[in-house]
């Protein structure tokens, strides 16, 4: 949580989804955060990680692992090497890709970590 520029991949527009909760909690805590939701393009939410107009330091994966692997591969091409993988978004393929490409991947819950901040 030491980095300020985040992208959350998942259903950031659906109030009942964890991606939405993480996206909004990061904003509340003062982080620069955008959403990545394939098929969606609106304020602060991008169809593709390549469309984000500034450098992302951390990618938070809160999406189906099959879609997540594609996003991780794109992130790697852009030089993003820090990924937080939420429970349910992990897969052996994602973990192996991260290892093979020197990406610092951590499995954990952003909401739990954010709740520790004052």
Question: Which sequence ranges carry the predicted segments?
Answer:
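NAD(P)-binding Rossmann-fold cofactor-contacting core
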Residues: 14-16, 20-43
């Amino acid at each position: 949580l030491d980095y300020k520029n985040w992208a959350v991949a998942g259903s950031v527009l659906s109030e009942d989804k964890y991606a939405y909760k993480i996206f909004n909690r990061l904003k509340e805590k003062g982080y620069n955060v955008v959403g990545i939701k394939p098929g969606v393009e609106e304020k602060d939410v991008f169809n593709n990680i390549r469309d984000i107009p500034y450098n992302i330091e951390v990618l938070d994966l809160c999406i189906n692992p099959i879609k997540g692997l594609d996003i991780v591969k794109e992130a790697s091409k852009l030089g993003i090497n820090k990924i937080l993988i939420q429970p349910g978004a992990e897969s052996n393929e994602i973990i192996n890709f991260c290892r093979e490409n020197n990406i610092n991947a951590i499995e954990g819950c952003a909401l739990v970590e954010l709740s520790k901040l004052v």
